Amino acid sequence: MKNVRLLYNPRSGGKRRHTQLDAALAVLHDSGVNASVIATQSSDEVTAKAREAVTEGCDTVFACGGDGTIHDVVQGIARTPVALAILPLGTANALAHDLRVPLHPVAAARAALSAHPRQIALGQLRYVSLQGKPANCYFVVAAGVGVDAHLFYKLQSGMKQRLGMAAYYAKAWHLWMTHKMRRFVVEYSEPDGKVVTCSDVTELLAVRIQHFGGVLKELAPGASRDRNDVRLVLCRSSSRAVYLRYVFRGLVGAQWKVSGVELAHSREIECTLDPAVATSSNRVYIEA
């Protein structure tokens, strides 16, 4: 690690996190690393600055934030030799938990200095944008289709800071409980090449990591960033109680099966959606 950029959102985290970021930067400078901090104002700017870091010869880009910031940085450095490093400044920090990155930014900076870069497979989503144009993006943690995706779409970036955490979670719960669970078609290939078609899916998650941290121990048992596929969670029930039972199973670390929820490994998944499920596209491809 010689030449790095640290990308962060100055509107997120408050004064305390800015102080932690400055302390982490000092750790890098004290180790002889050429490091600079770049403030960003939007997801698109994070991705653009990450791409600039690649063209300017940086060997590492630090995502200083949560999983959303990591996602934006990955869009800019995927398929390049530039390494991703993390200073956990977000709310959930799922990828940091899975990688066992220290959650204090200064400790995370020290850990990055002694770490060795390694390649992992990325998930890729191909879809049609809201403007009707073909688009794609990469994901590291998970991708989803259904009510969870609707929730994240509605709870746009920055809402936590505007509403406060209590109001944010209240809004999330209201959206999740009131949004109609519609069925869509999922076709995926199993590791042995067998193609499976499910015509009654109400919720789909494609998960790349094992540990999400916090109270959620395992959302998708069998998922691993060391594999070259995703772990699918297919909910085939319109009952929210079924999905809640499955999530509760992960909260307590239990291994019991939940009727109406299936798990599978796959490298290629195709979803055919009713427009009411997702207004952005009627066809989504997920690859790993």
Residue ranges and their predicted role:
Residues R5, S31, T40, A78-A83, ...:
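Catalytic core of DAGKc-family lipid kinases
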Residues A26, D148, G158-R183, R231-V261:
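Alpha-helical membrane-targeting segments
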Residues P10, C64-G66, L89:
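Glycine-rich beta-strand-to-loop/alpha-helix junction loops that act as flexible
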Residues M1-V61, H71, A107:
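ATP/NTP phosphate-donor binding region
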Residues V46, G68-V73, A94, I120:
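Short glycine/serine/threonine-rich phosphate/pyrophosphate-binding segments
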Residues E190, C198, S224-R227, R231-A288:
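ATP/nucleoside-binding phosphotransfer catalytic cores, i.e., glycine-rich phosphate-binding loops
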Residues G144, D148, L205-P221:
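Glycine-rich phosphate/pyrophosphate-binding beta-alpha loops
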